[in-house]
Every structure is written in C-alpha cells, then in structure tokens.
From Swiss-Prot:
It is an enzyme of class 3 (hydrolase). The active site is at 349 (charge relay system), 469 (charge relay system), 499 (charge relay system). Homodimer. Gene3D superfamilies: 1.10.246.70, alpha/beta hydrolase, Galactose-binding domain-like. It is found in: Cytoplasm. Keywords: Aminopeptidase, Cytoplasm, Hydrolase, Protease, Serine protease. Pfam families: Peptidase_S15 (PF02129), PepX_C (PF08530), PepX_N (PF09168). This is Xaa-Pro dipeptidyl-peptidase. GO terms for molecular function: aminopeptidase activity; dipeptidyl-peptidase activity; serine-type peptidase activity. It catalyses: Hydrolyzes Xaa-Pro-|- bonds to release unblocked, N-terminal dipeptides from substrates including Ala-Pro-|-p-nitroanilide and (sequentially) Tyr-Pro-|-Phe-Pro-|-Gly-Pro-|-Ile.
Amino acid sequence: MRYNQFSYIPTSLERAAEELKELGFDLDLQKTAKANLESFLRKLFFHYPDSDYPLSHLIAKNDMDALSFFQSEQELSKEVFDLLALQVLGFIPGVDFTEADAFLDKLAFPIHFDETEIIKHIHHLLATRCKSGMTLIDDLVSQGMLTMDNDYHFFNGKSLATFDTSQLIREVVYVEAPLDTDQDGQLDLIKVNIIRPQSQKPLPTLMTPSPYHQGINEVANDKKLYRMEKELVVKKRRQITVEDRDFIPLETQPCKLPIGQNLESFSYINSYSLNDYFLARGFANIYVSGVGTAGSTGFMTSGDYAQIESFKAVIDWLNGRATAYTSHSKTHQVRADWANGLVCTTGKSYLGTMSTGLATTGVDGLAMIIAESAISSWYNYYRENGLVCSPGGYPGEDLDVLTELTYSRNLLAGDYLRHNDRYQELLNQQSQALDRQSGDYNQFWHDRNYLKNAHQIKCDVVYTHGLQDWNVKPRQVYEIFNALPSTINKHLFLHQGEHVYMHNRQSIDFRESMNALLCQKLLGLANDFSLPEMIWQDNTCPQNWQERKVFGTSTIKELDLGQELLLIDNHYGEDEFKAYGKDFRAFKAALFEGKANQALVDILLEEDLPINGEIVLQLKVKSSENKGLLSAQILDYGKKKRLGDLPIALTQSSIDNGQNFSRESLKELPFREDSYRVISKGFMNLQNRNNLSSIETIPNNKWMTVRLPLQPTIYHLEKGDTLRVILYTTDFEHTVRDNSNYALTIDLSQSQLIVPIASN
C-alpha cells in the first residue's frame, strides 16, 4: 500500500479542535500531547465499557504496550506516535511491518510528527485511509460512533454517513419529455427510480443516466451482430459535408392536474456503489434509463440529442421546469419537493457518455458530472479514420446492435405486441443511416458528436479514464478534456487500468475527493477544497499517482524506424484466417509474438522517453491494389514488472459505504512481470489518409505519405527499454476482416515515429 492523499483539506489548529469536539473527542489545547493522544485512543474504543483492555492490545514500543506507556512517565515521541497511528489504521506489527520507519517511508505516510501539532495530527489521522480502504473517521462512523439522525454532519469538508439507509424511500415517477421519438403523437414518458433518505432538508441528487438499468436484451443483441469477414470496400473519391444542427425540443404545456400522493414503489434496483456511499451521506440517488427502455416510452435513438433530452427532462423536473406523473395514466402529477435542484451525474461507459452529452446542453441544475470511461464522439467508438472499427472485445458490434441491447421495451411482452413493428421500422432506418458499408463520417455520426458542443459546458467536470481501455479508447477523454472551456473547473484521473471503475482503489482517495467536491457544489459547503486538474497513475511502479499539467504536449521527438523496405502481406491461409476469426485473442497473441503478418521494428531507447499525448506514425507506404487498411500498435516490449490492467480484490467486503450498508471489496492493479504492454494503437483506411472528410483514391504501387495518429496516452519508458512498432493490415479484434490478396510496402528510410514528450 502507498498513500496518495488528495482529499485532505489542511486545517487550522482551532478548526481542527472544533471539528474533533463536534465528534465527541475530549481534547484540550492546554493538555499535553500525550494526554490528548490517550484521550483520542480511548474514544476509538467506544464499544468497550473499559477502554483499558483494547488499549493494552496496542503497543507503544517494541517492548511496551500502549496502556503501560500511558500509565508511565515516559514522554510521547515520534516513534511512539507513528507506531500507534499505524495500528489504529489497521496495520499489524510483525505482520504488515517490522521496522516502522521503513514501512512509513514505503507507505509515503502523510503525517509527520510534531508534538506541538498533536491536535492537527489527530485530525489528519481521522481523515486518513485505513488498511481496509476506509478513512478512520468513516470506519468509526460505520461502527456507530455517530447516530443516524438523517441530518448532515461534516468532517474535514466531507459529509459523514449519518443518514439511515434502513429506512430509505423508494419511489417511481414518470417525467414528461419534450420528445416523440417513436412518432406516435404522444410525448415520451421517462421512468425515474428514486432512492432517498428520509430528511427534513432539501436533498441534492446523484443521477445515473443508464440505458442498461431497466434490463438488456442480449438475445436481440447477439442476433444483430455483424459478420466481420468482408472485403474492404473501394470508395468513390469525394468530400464529406455535415452541418451543425441544433436540437429543437417539442413544446410542452403547464400541468394543471392535482398533486398525487400514492407513488409507485419498488424494492430493489441494481445500484452503483459510489452512489450508495453518497446515499448514506445525504444525497438522493436516481436511476434513469431514458427513451425506449422498459417503463418508459419512445424509441432508443442511441446517442443523439433526443436521447440526451430524455435525461435532461429529469433535471428540469427536479428544478420545477417539467412535469412528472404518478403513473402512465397521467391522472396526477408529482413534484420533487424533496430536492434542492442540484444534480451530479455518475456512471461509467454509456452512463458516463450520457453525462457528457447532458453537460453539453448547459442545463441549469446540473452542477457537476463524474464521467468514467465516457464516449465523446460515437463515430470514434464504432469507426476510426474511415474504417468500421469495433470497440475492443466486441467485434461485430455497431450502434444499432447497441440499440437492440438497450431497447428494453421489448422485454415487456405487452409493449412488444403493441410497438415492435414500429420499432423495427425505426431500427432499420438507424441501420441504414450509420452506413456500415463505407465506415465514413456522416450527418448521423455528427449528430452524435458531443465535441462540437463542448463550449456550452458550464458545470464542474470530473473524468476518469483507463489508458489501457481499448473499449472506450483514450482519445475519447483526450479530445473532450482538451475541448472544455477554460472558465469551468475540470479534473481528470488517468489510471493504468482498462474499462473499469476506480472509486474502490487502495492507492488513491478518489471517493473522499468526490465527497469534498460534491459538498462544495451540491451542498454549498465552503470547505476550501482544491483538487489538482489532472492526476496520472505512474506506469513504472505500483501505487504512485502524480499531478500533471496537461494531457498532450507540443514538444516532440522523432524516432527513425530504419532503412529497409518492409512488405506486409494482407492474405492468410484459409485455416489460419478462420482460426483468427474464431478467436481474436489468438490473433493478438500471434501478433505480439511476431507470428502474424506484420512489419516489426524494435527501437532500443538510449534515454528515457516520457510520452504525453498523441503518437503519430509518419509513413511512406504503397499498396499493391487500389485499397488498403493500415493498423499499428506500439508496445513496451521485453520482460519486466508492469502494472496489470484489471484490478484485483485485496480484501473482500472491507469497505462499508454507510453504517453496515452496501459493502464492497478493496481493489488495486497488480504489479507483476510480463512480456509486453500495449502503449497505443491506431487504424486507418488509406483512402482517408489526409483527413476524415476527404475520400481519395489509392494509386496502385505508388508511394503515399501517411500520418497515422495513434491513441493518446501518458506513458514513461526508461533508458534501455525496447519500444516495439508493429505495422499490419487486418486486425481481427477491431477492423473488418478482409482476406484479399494485396500487400503494403513501407519505406522505413522515409518513415518516423513522432512522439510527444512530457517536459521536466
């Protein structure tokens, strides 16, 4: 374990003493440091009628227990304080450590003893994470140190778990959206699942916009998947034009219906544990699946601003600008009289994507988004540089396949009976509009590109993204983060994992940092919390997070690729082609082992190479035919210890998100030896070699200069490392599987790898 503490708010002595007193710690500025520490420790054992017993189970020195120490005349020293602090946080002498000083250095322990600062040290200790993954104060509250009185209690600028999660209100409302996506002449109704604590105070809201939450149709999804085995189409030379079109909602009328009291209820919905954490701290949770999902009406428009509007309508309702009904019969309306109108959206992948789309509307009431692994351009999710390009792990998927997965209205037999014929008509229109044949950008994709509206974002923004996420690739966050207005507060966490959440990591206090931010933005707490704009997980060692100023630098280093002419054959034998198509993982293994069709260049680094941004391959290339696709991957190659990309559980259910509520495991990325690590990758239809809007011909056996931008990253390579460049055609995980008989030739003498370099 290593501390990377970003959530602690430096506090004055007077304020620290005041907050400790509010928690019931009987500390006195006039007492000695030793007396105050003893008083603090005894308070920790509030379950015991006699605190001597648990105190005797701690050691103050290697040869003296804590009870004996406090009964002695010995003075408090750094060694005693450190040893006791470690034990209070759950570290066991002789098990977790033998030499406290060395262990503290390894931990990067954030508290440095000064006898005159004991009150501040105790305050800091309470806000520091235990071995279990919870801060000490959260651990104490989870054990019942504070009663669940359904009111706010704060410590170090963060809300504590004092809301009763055993008496939650669970209710359903149906919000009227200014849409008619299925064109039935009726405004669409949006189902909203609300979970909120009982409270006399207006509550802020965490909203998870999740098209998955009302169920998914995996059978329809699998039937809709596309075969990837097809020839690469030769496209006609042309220029693509699109236009920015403002989304215009339909008109709605003020509701004059009576207020209803009898709301639909529910017992369970699959929740997001970060939401649960805040539910226990006085934040209502709502789950909204949007148009075309079970319980709602309309068509699943998948990614456009009509879908975004269905979520926006819910924020409007929370602020009194839209109507909600108690049921589909629309006999009574219901108002959000429990809400303070301020909303933060949460969720990963499609959920985080909807957060980004919502933010670009500039809707009033949306104070903040926490968007994890979020899409900012749907074209860049299902296409790349004029190619159909499947997200990592999902060959054959496209946006209409996702529509089939998430159109959960068809899971309700009655809805299927009444609406499936119309749904199939609209789905067919969507399938035609996305133009899988060419892979080109068009108006359909432009209408699903949130980047063009990034300037309208006015809420605070928090993004998290994995630099090993080949599902929602790093370009998605790179482009939106760098397009955000300079006038807003923005934060980016870049971790070394894949398509995963990061709130329950051991090495970073993400959960607590979000607590401090949300208390500022949604509760109006003046806590003076300041979070760095960008935090990056170091790839060279375990559990090390660093501040960064930018994602993408203008300083470049050009690396020569050699002097040879390299031939890349596209064609595989029938058996090999079928085997790779059946299991793309076998293809990846062969590719990285140098066995698949490829041109391979190894570069032994003579100095450190701190990459920050978008690597570009500038290549001199020719094709034997009038078509060609180019794929590239950059590897950190050779055996050494590296971070894994999938977090593993360190402890099971050690994190309590409230008071015995919604427990979850503590996780971390492992650090272990392997043979290589993918740094970046990229794909291009050579007919789109100059830009996305220009379709050009490929002259047979004529040299072309191609600039292939790879996925942006931040990655540190060290002197002596090997940077491996792999150039090839068909990628069996991502691209169409064209087995036609053509070849590409690369002139390495006129080719370079252009690397953006982080400044010192």
